[in-house]
Structures are given as C-alpha cells and as structure tokens.
C-alpha cells in the first residue's frame, strides 16, 4: 500500500486450497467487492497460486458483468499455467473447474521473488508443466529445460524459462 492509488485498496482474503474453490467462496468474494464499493471500473488484483487466480479471475469476469483483473501468481505452476490463457472458474458438483469462463487478465506480473519461497513439491509441479510446454516448443528451449537444475535452481534463469514457457 505504498502507492497513493492503493490507499483505498481493500484486501479480500480467501483459503487457497482446491477445496475452497467453490460457489460459497466466490459468493464471499462478490459480497466483499460489493461491500467495498467495487464497480465495473475497479481492478481486482489476484495474488496467489492457481486456485486464487482461477477463482479471482472468475469473480472479476462475472461481477457487474465484468471488471478488469490482474494476476500475480505466486507458485511456479500458476506462473506457467493457471494465470495465463484466460482460464477462470470454480469447482462444482464434485467436478474440477466445472463452471468458468475464458477471460484474460489485463496483466500478469511474474516475479522470481515468490519462486524462492516454494518447497520442492511445488517447484517440481510447475517444472513438470514447463516440460510439457517444452515438448511443444523449440529444440533449444527443450534442451534448456532439460539442462536446468531444478534441485538447485538459479531463480533468475528459472524466471527466463517461465517467460519462454508462457510465450
């Protein structure tokens, strides 16, 4: 909240588990937006992993018939998958991503700062998705991915590989 424009920002906190990717959590976000006076001209910033960017993007896409949103993905998997491509949605009726829309974020902000906080499981999960992308990419990019040491990551190099993965 160091920026003047952010002084009026409202924080909406939700559980970031797949079990919370529900209509109830969505209604909570809609209610918070409504109580906070959000309009179609407001901006929702989704800071978190894939569950947060999926649900937040869907909330923004459907509140007041659509408002702008920005994704700031904090996991490697969300940086290379969930936060790009406009996929938004919630789980419903026991099915994953059963209700949603495609609506791209105004911007996606990638930072290696978040990647430095991840445990091994989260790094490997995102790296596996990058390898899938690499199979469809150039032989040079594929070689870079295979040569990257995910067990001792250089986060600046990793962020460059993320950028290639989402391009």
Language-model region placement:
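Conserved strand-to-helix beginnings and helix N-cap segments that scaffold or border functional pockets
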Residues: 23-26, 56-57, 121
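A glycine/threonine-rich phosphate-anchoring loop and its flanking beta-alpha core
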Residues: 58-153
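Active-site and donor-binding regions of nucleotide-sugar-utilizing enzymes
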Residues: 38-70
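Amphipathic, well-packed alpha-helical segments that form the structural scaffold of globular domains
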Residues: 30, 128, 163-167
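Residue-level detector of flexible, active-site-proximal loop/helix-junction positions
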Residues: 16-18, 51, 76
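ATP/NTP phosphate-donor binding region
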Residues: 1-43
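Oxyanion-binding "anion nests"
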Residues: 146-167
């Amino acid at each position: 909240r160091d920026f003047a424009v952010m002084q009026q920002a409202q924080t909406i906190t939700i559980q970031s588990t797949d079990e919370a990717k529900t209509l109830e959590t969505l209604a909570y976000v809609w209610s918070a937006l409504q109580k906070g006076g959000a309009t179609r001209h407001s901006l929702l910033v989704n800071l978190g992993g894939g569950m947060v960017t999926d649900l937040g993007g869907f909330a923004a896409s459907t509140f007041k018939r659509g408002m702008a949103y920005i994704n700031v993905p904090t996991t490697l998997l969300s940086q290379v998958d969930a936060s790009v491509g406009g996929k938004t949605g919630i789980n419903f009726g026991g099915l994953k991503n059963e209700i949603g829309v495609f609506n791209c974020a105004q911007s996606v902000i990638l930072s290696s700062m978040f990647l430095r906080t991840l445990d091994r499981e989260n790094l490997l999960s995102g790296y596996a998705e990058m390898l899938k992308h690499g199979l469809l990419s150039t032989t040079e990019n594929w070689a870079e991915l295979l040569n990257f040491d995910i067990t001792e990551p250089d986060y600046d190099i990793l962020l460059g590989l993320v950028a290639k993965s989402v391009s």
